[in-house]
Amino acid sequence: MNLKPGVAWIIGGGSGIGAAVARELAGHGWQVAISGRRLDRLEEVSASHSGIHAYPLDITDAEAVAATVTAIAADFGRVDLLLYGAVAATGTPPGSYDAARFAAAFDVNVMGLVRLLDPVITQMSRQPTGGQIAVISSLAGYVGLPRGGAYAATKSALITLCQTMRVELEPKRIIVRLITPGFVKSELTARNRYRMPMLMETEDAAWRIVDGLVRSTRFEIAFPWPMVFVMKAARLLPYRLFFWLSALTLRAR
């Protein structure tokens, strides 16, 4: 399968992977709407290509979400691809489970997507060719590791939600895709104070995502493969061994 250029909407398109994917898609003839809270970031990205268009949005505002879906559909006639990449990355100190910190992470990372689903599904269901919903999770969502409680929990929630949606939305001609990258250079990863194996350039990650989206309909786009293998294998370990190895990572940081 080779997905023809159409209309894409990227949530979190003002920086990082979202911005890089917007440029990659626009370079291949797509019309790309990008959304995020910071208008200055969106305008900077949209100025880089005539096919990129800024739609400021607070993903925690359900009414604004519905209005933005309506606006994009009115401007372009359709939404062929939704890429959800909004992220609130919150580190959690070992043994600390602050409710406000967890709530903030879930409100953006998970509930932000949920607020989009009904209006986007309604729009895509009207389209003869349906559409695609792609969600950027993380390899961190495969297992729970120290200091990543809130972030990993949200990414794990996205993985299981996408698994559910893949089956439920197929009759509506909507293909759900899960994207699980490892460490990718961004403002968020720049804050990390620990070793990040196989840290990837943002543009490389964007190319892999776009290539996976347009060339196939497989469920998961995961990379880099050595990290994917390690993290998926970790899920198969006996808990006693897994917890012992997990404790080693806590001491090593």
What positions do the PLM features span?
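Rossmann-fold cofactor-recognition segment
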Residues: 48-63
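C-terminal helical subdomain
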Residues: 178, 194-231
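Active-site loop immediately N-terminal to the catalytic Tyr-X3-Lys motif
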Residues: 95, 145-149
